[in-house]
């Protein structure tokens, strides 16, 4: 295992100003890791489990910095780092709604000329597998521009745009959401087990899933996706026929949307799953707050 930064640490990233900056990753146990960013410096030792976490002293707002991490054998750098305000956009579909899909979102995206917003989208995956590793490797901090800002959460975009107008610094948004999920999906198992309601929900889900294998879950999901696509095709046909059709009329003609999805340990709707595969992958990245 060689020295490695967590996936969220990429070129063009934004780190929180005026607060201690947490930098973390993996490496060879017992090796010393040094971390520097602009005028801040820190060192730490890789733990027995191969993880490390260092804390840099606070920095004022600024841009064009280089983050350097080294264990004496391997060195990694991240360039074009900005120090500004960082917010995590979390939740379900109301936060997940992309700017391009919101009211006037396409026009707003095309007209956007700002340079002060950057965003990182945590890979949406409910299993820590090879695909998850590939998605994290491909993930990137992006400088919001007309050609990509439509991908950003609409809520987060308007929040960041207003914040950028009020503050003379770069605004960083960490997108971490999944439509239709409950808070239980984003909580650790230990936290769920610490309260009666959490214990009850975990027990109920385990009883429902039982000994279902990954293969069985995959087969159920294929059947579910086929049903959903058939329903969506009927909805699209009705809307093409009558653009002003109401949801009541759609439901009468096409039936209710197939929901919920099948249960399974690989499901994003399984309690604690997204805590492991999404939230924990970016914690403890230093933030100003959470939307």
Language model regions located:
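Cell-envelope and extracellular/periplasmic
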Residues: 1-291
């Amino acid at each position: 295992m060689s020295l490695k930064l967590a996936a969220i640490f990429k070129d063009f990233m934004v780190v929180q100003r005026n607060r201690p900056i947490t930098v973390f990753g993996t490496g060879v146990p017992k090796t010393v890791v040094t971390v520097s960013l602009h005028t801040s410096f820190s060192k730490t030792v890789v733990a027995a489990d191969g993880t490390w976490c260092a804390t840099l002293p606070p920095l004022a707002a600024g841009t064009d910095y280089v983050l350097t991490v080294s264990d004496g054998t391997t060195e990694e750098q991240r360039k074009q780092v900005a120090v500004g305000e960082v917010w995590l956009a979390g939740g379900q579909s109301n936060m997940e709604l992309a700017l391009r899909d919101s009211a006037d979102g396409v026009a707003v995206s095309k007209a956007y000329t700002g340079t002060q917003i950057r965003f990182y989208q945590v890979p949406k995956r409910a299993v820590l597998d090879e695909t998850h590793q590939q998605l994290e490797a491909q993930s990137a901090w992006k400088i919001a521009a007309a050609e990509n800002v439509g991908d950003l959460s609409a809520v987060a975009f308007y929040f960041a745009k207003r914040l950028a107008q009020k503050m003379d610094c770069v605004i960083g948004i960490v997108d971490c959401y999944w439509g239709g999920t409950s808070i239980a999906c984003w909580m650790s198992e230990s936290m769920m087990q610490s309260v009666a309601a959490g214990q009850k929900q975990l027990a109920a889900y385990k009883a429902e899933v039982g000994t279902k294998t990954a293969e069985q879950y995959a087969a159920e999901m294929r059947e579910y996706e086929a049903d959903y696509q058939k329903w969506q095709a009927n909805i699209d046909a009705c809307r093409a026929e009558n653009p002003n059709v109401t949801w009541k009329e759609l439901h009468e003609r096409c039936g209710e949307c197939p929901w919920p999805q099948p249960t399974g340990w690989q499901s994003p709707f399984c309690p604690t799953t997204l805590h492991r595969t999404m939230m924990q992958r970016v914690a403890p990245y230093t933030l100003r707050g959470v939307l």
